[in-house]
Amino acid sequence: MVAPHLWLRAETKPLEERSALTPRTAKILADAGFQITIERSSQRAFKDKEFERLGFPMVPEGSWRHAPKDAYIIGLKELPENDNSPLKHTHIQFAHCYKNQEGWREVLSRFPAGNGLLYDLEFLQDDNGRRVAAFGYHAGFAGSAISCLVWAHQLLHPNKQFPAIRPFPNEKSLVRHVARQVRLALKKNNNQYPRILVIGALGRCGTGACDLASKIGIPFDNILRWDINETKKGGPFTEITESDIFVNCIYLSMPIPKFCTVESLNVPNRKLRVVCDVSCDTTNPNNPIPIYNVNTTFDHPTVEVKGVTTPPPLEVISIDHLPTLLPRESSEAFSEALIPSLLALKDVDNAPVWVRAKKLYETMVQKL
C-alpha cells in the first residue's frame, strides 16, 4: 500500500492564521508513514521554521496546483479568489457549498470539472453522525470575547467605530484583555455586568461562548443558556431585546422561525447592543437572524443594523473564521481531533468516514 501524501496548502484568506496541520500533528502522520509536504506561509500562526525543524520538505505558497495528482490537498478555508479553474486533486477543506450558500454552484462545479474530489471537513462524521473535528468551541469562545469587547467599547467610546482586532497568542492573554475592558466599562454601566444570551448553549460552540463569559468574571445568573427546549416555542424572542449581548451558536440544518427581526428589535427600552452570529449563515435563506447581510472581518469586525432607530446602538459581528482569534490553540485542538480520520486515509476506499464524505460529495454534484 502506497503511503498517502498530504500537502498542506497555505491559507490565502486575509488574516487566517489557523492551520489544518500543526508541526505536532504533521509529525504524528509522518511517523505513521505518511508523506507530508508543507507550503510556506507568511501568515500561518506556526512559523515555517517550526516545520523545517522537524525535517518536512517546504515548497512555495500556492504550489499545490502542481502537486502530484495523488496528493491530498489539505487546508481550511476557501481556495484563492478569482480562480474558477478546474480542480484535479482531492481536496480536504471547508468549502461552504453544501447548504445553498451564495455561489455554491460555482465553488462545487470546479471539482467535477477537473475530475477532482472534495472531502468537506464540515461533513466528516463518525458512525453516530457526529462531526469528527470542529472548531466550534473556539468559535464560540472567540465570538463571545469579541462581543464583550464591542459592548465595552460602546460604553467607553460612544459613537466611535469598533477598531480592527488581531489574533491573540493564547487564551490567557485574550481573557485578560477582555476582562480588563469589561471592568472598565462597568463604571459606565452602574457597575452592572452585561446579560448574555447564548442560543445553542449545550453544543461545543455554545459551551465555548459560556466559558469565555465565566472566565472574564460575568456572574452565572447573567449568562442565559438556551438550547432547543427554550427555542422550540418559536421566535422572535423578547428575551433577546432584554439582553445586552446575544450570541447565536446553533447549527442550522433546516428552516426554523426567526430568532429576531429588525421589527422585533426596533422597540423602546431595548437593552441589546451586540449580536454575534457565530453560526454565520449570512447568505443562507433560512438564516434565523435576518438583520444583516454581510460578513464582517477582523479589520472591520462589526456592522450596524439598518432600520433599527431606537437607542442604544446595535451592532452585529458576523466574522466567518472566528477561531483564528486563537489560531494556535484552535488549530492544535482541531488537528488533533482530525488525526484518526487522516490516519484512515490509508484505507480511504473502505474507511466509513471517507466513504460517507465521498458519497455526500457525489450526491451534491448531482444537484449541479
Curated annotation (Swiss-Prot):
Cite the SUPFAM superfamilies for this sequence.
Answer: Formate/glycerate dehydrogenase catalytic domain-like (SSF52283), NAD(P)-binding Rossmann-fold domains (SSF51735)
Question: What Enzyme Commission number does this protein have?
Answer: 1.5.1.7
This protein's pathway reads: Amino-acid biosynthesis; L-lysine biosynthesis via AAA pathway; L-lysine from L-alpha-aminoadipate (fungal route): step 3/3
- Provide GO CC annotations from the record: cytoplasm
Q: Which Pfam families match?
A: AlaDh_PNT_N (PF05222)
An example of a GO molecular function for this protein is: saccharopine dehydrogenase (NAD+, L-lysine-forming) activity
Modified residue annotations for Phosphoserine: 85
Q: Where is the active site?
A: 77, 96
Subunit note? Monomer.
Protein name, as recorded? Saccharopine dehydrogenase [NAD(+), L-lysine-forming]
